[in-house]
UniProtKB/Swiss-Prot annotation:
Active site positions, chain numbering: 160 (proton donor), 375 (nucleophile)
Species in which this protein is naturally found: Streptococcus pneumoniae (strain JJA)
UniProt catalytic activity: a 6-phospho-beta-D-galactoside + H2O = D-galactose 6-phosphate + an alcohol
Entry GO terms, CC: cytosol
GO biological process, one term: lactose catabolic process via tagatose-6-phosphate
This protein's encoding gene: lacG
Membrane-spanning parts: none
Binding site for D-galactose 6-phosphate: 19, 116, 159-160, 297, 428-429, 435, 437
InterPro entries listed in its UniProt record: 6P-beta-galactosidase, Glyco_hydro_1, Glyco_hydro_1_AS, Glyco_hydro_1_N_CS, Glycoside_hydrolase_SF
Family the UniProt entry places it in: Belongs to the glycosyl hydrolase 1 family.
HAMAP family the record matches: LacG
Alphabetical list of Gene3D superfamilies matching this protein: Glycosidases
Protein name: 6-phospho-beta-galactosidase
Amino acid sequence: MTKTLPKDFIFGGATAAYQAEGATHTDGKGPVAWDKYLEDNYWYTAEPASDFYNRYPVDLKLAEEYGVNGIRISIAWSRIFPTGYGQVNAKGVEFYHNLFAECHKRHVEPFVTLHHFDTPEALHSNGDFLNRENIEHFVDYAAFCFEEFPEVNYWTTFNEIGPIGDGQYLVGKFPPGIQYDLAKVFQSHHNMMVSHACAVKLYKEKGYKGEIGVVHALPTKYPLDPENPADVRAAELEDIIHNKFILDATYLGRYSAETMEGVNHILSVNGGSLDLREEDFTALEAAKDLNDFLGINYYMSDWMEAFDGETEIIHNGKGEKGSSKYQIKGIGRRVAPDYVSRTDWDWIIYPQGLYDQIMRVKKDYPNYKKIYITENGLGYKDEFVDNTVYDDGRIDYVKQHLEILSDAIADGANVKGYFIWSLMDVFSWSNGYEKRYGLFYVDFETQERYPKKSAHWYKKVAETQIID
């Protein structure tokens, strides 16, 4: 049976400042940690990325032409405050006013994120969100943006608090490149959630007319053998690291006894302790019912089995299928069952995981209000032929996930929109320019845009709400 989505459903496309804008040192923009980190550790940089800084009118015109009625944009913090605080960069402010005006001109609603992996270097080198001073700096930055940009109707504080901590302190593929420090992972998650809570409370106290939420990456975790208690435990612990800890902070305003038992076990095995203060929980508690929506980024699920050995994580950054490894002492090891398929970057394709995660939020956090799928898509080594890309695999991937959303809505979940990652091809943090996600192919040398087959398909779905 053909499935449908509601008439008022947002069919969006997602971007991020550092991955799309380029212009990393233009018009007074301050440095971010990624600038030097990429030069020192990778074979690519974020110049020119998709040159969105100059070509956003082209991308928004394409969005309008192809039925995309929402766009995720992030503000580059260091474009507004080059050092993270203090002096405002007027040219950065002007750029975002112009960008948001173009969005509204093209009838593409901007969903604006304040922080998408790009803390200004001056703050990052001072401990980033492990340093509690950053909480205050972030809230000041948020307060400025809320007041300066009343044309924005939908705000999110952070993009993917979980993967920021993981990338910086567990996998070590984000600056500062620290590996296997679980205490830093949890502390980063916690301090960022306190920052989120303070910003949300401020937004509501000021009486702004828009909506505000947060974007969490929520990869669903399953036991490899559901009958094996050790595998079940491994999946539960992995879920605490990546999902439950930050969801509890968002919607409970505290960490459940079950969550803290898992955290304490993980730290007892791996070392370290947390600084959780009474005033933190006062802030979390005050904001737990103020979130207007939850953004869920979903790409994949993982299966876990019990594991007693030493921690080892190998990141597959070049699309060499089967080269990744993930095992954490005292938690478990990721082992994919035979029946699931995976991408060249070892990301497991499992649409059912999105349904299960949405229903988990609905059941465990009934104060969630509504959900947007703020990122979902398929990274490909696209083959550019005849001025297009015949990306049937991407179409199939998105179709399956949209069908899952139709099912979730039918089963009572309040899902209001979907943002494909990404609107156009963008630079990828730890994969460079080879891994493409866009509806529009970008020739990174000429910066020309070309609609892929998926863009034509997405337009039809957006216009009809029929998933076909």
